[in-house]
């Protein structure tokens, strides 16, 4: 049987998608070869790539004046690519700091520009939270404002989209496609694929057309969004299989009823899990309710010494990858789009049984 996979990334993929990929692996649509072996310049592959983009545009309702790029190097490469692409005419940017991933982004940006760090991570009644925008020291003349919507490691998520004057840039790696989003509020959106989009090796960048001419002169051509946009994200050979598989995920999402429909399921999963944790004396979640992530649910046990036993027994019950990030410890259940409601229900049953036996 397939286990329930709560990994933060590379994450669970829909079983139907994996089955279709398996079925097409050796002989893609009767062509006598795998799509992995196909030239990225061939008419067949270009059609696959174009359909993936069209389906993503449909899912996210992406306006015409935005380019969608299918790039390589993970979201971490974009920590450099973004300032190199956007600080060519104005060297100043604001970075909102709420956790480990936004910190990685701002540290990299400091190598290329004059970065104003907005400290927005706070504690409310002992729980981690994000401060009100009225308390932020935003610049009047920033080229852009950067934030990470969902801190995958901490399980901390913005309750809404910040309202700023400068173009808004956001790392949506662990929350893209999990809830409806007004793309027109952003100058640039980026996301590593390996959580809600597809397998590792692909990064999506959605950029408004007017920002394509802001690059620094010294930017490597492979990182230049304008060059990638002109060349259909194929300045060099793209991650063809990851692009294809992501296209299958987009098809699957459309079949589920799109982002609105999957969002309802995601809310149900999150409410069930947080509801159980809050009702328990044995488990604790460290995040203030308004800023709880609907994708990444961290929790601790009443006795830290039981963690290894919890993970071992969880694995024996086909509940995988529940260890928290090495930097923070504890547990974390990542409940992305492909994790079914039944998986969360099975996790809660196990957690309840474990607490009764060890509490």
From Swiss-Prot:
Disulfide links within the chain: none
Positions of L-glutamate binding: 41
Catalysed transformations (reactions): O-phospho-L-serine + 2-oxoglutarate = 3-phosphooxypyruvate + L-glutamate; 4-(phosphooxy)-L-threonine + 2-oxoglutarate = (R)-3-hydroxy-2-oxo-4-phosphooxybutanoate + L-glutamate
Domain of life of the native organism: Bacteria
SUPFAM superfamilies per record: PLP-dependent transferases
Record-listed N6-(pyridoxal phosphate)lysine modification sites: 195
Keyword Transcription regulation applies: no
Bilayer-crossing regions: none
Annotated metabolic or biological route of this protein: Amino-acid biosynthesis; L-serine biosynthesis; L-serine from 3-phospho-D-glycerate: step 2/3; Cofactor biosynthesis; pyridoxine 5'-phosphate biosynthesis; pyridoxine 5'-phosphate from D-erythrose 4-phosphate: step 3/5
One Gene Ontology cellular component: cytoplasm
EC number(s) per entry: 2.6.1.52
Protein name: Phosphoserine aminotransferase
Native source species: Acinetobacter baumannii (strain ATCC 17978 / DSM 105126 / CIP 53.77 / LMG 1025 / NCDC KC755 / 5377)
């Amino acid at each position: 049987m397939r286990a329930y996979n709560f990994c933060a990334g590379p994450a669970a993929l829909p079983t139907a998608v994996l089955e279709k990929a398996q079925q097409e692996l050796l002989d893609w649509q009767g062509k006598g070869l795998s799509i992995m072996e196909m030239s990225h310049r061939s008419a067949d592959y270009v059609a696959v790539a174009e359909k993936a983009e069209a389906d993503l545009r449909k899912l996210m309702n992406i306006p015409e004046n935005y380019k969608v790029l299918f790039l390589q190097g993970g979201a971490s490469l974009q920590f450099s690519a973004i300032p190199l692409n956007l600080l060519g005419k104005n060297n100043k940017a604001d970075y909102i700091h709420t956790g480990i991933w936004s910190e990685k982004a701002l540290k990299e940006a400091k190598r290329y520009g004059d970065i104003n760090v907005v400290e927005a991570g706070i504690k409310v009644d002992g729980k981690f939270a994000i401060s009100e925008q009225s308390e932020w020291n935003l610049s009047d003349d920033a080229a852009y404002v950067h934030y990470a919507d969902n801190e995958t490691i901490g399980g901390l998520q913005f309750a809404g989209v910040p309202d700023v004057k400068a173009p808004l840039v956001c790392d949506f790696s662990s929350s893209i496609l999990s809830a409806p989003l007004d793309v027109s509020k952003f100058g640039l959106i980026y996301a590593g694929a390996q959580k809600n989009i597809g397998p590792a090796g692909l990064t999506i960048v959605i950029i408004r057309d007017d920002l394509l001419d802001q690059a620094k002169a010294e930017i490597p051509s492979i990182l230049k969004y304008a060059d990638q946009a002109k060349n259909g994200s194929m300045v060099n050979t793209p991650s063809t299989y990851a692009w294809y598989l992501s296209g299958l995920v987009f098809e699957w999402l459309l079949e589920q009823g799109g982002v609105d429909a999957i969002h309802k399921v995601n809310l149900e999963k999150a409410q069930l899990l947080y509801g159980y944790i809050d009702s328990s004396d044995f488990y604790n979640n460290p995040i203030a309710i308004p800023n709880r992530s609907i994708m990444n649910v961290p929790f601790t046990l009443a006795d830290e010494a039981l963690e290894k036993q919890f993970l071992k027994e969880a694995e024996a019950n086909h509940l995988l990858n529940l260890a928290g990030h090495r930097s923070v410890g504890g547990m974390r259940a990542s409940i992305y789009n492909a994790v079914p409601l039944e998986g969360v229900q099975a996790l809660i049953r196990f957690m309840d049984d474990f607490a009764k036996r060890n509490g």
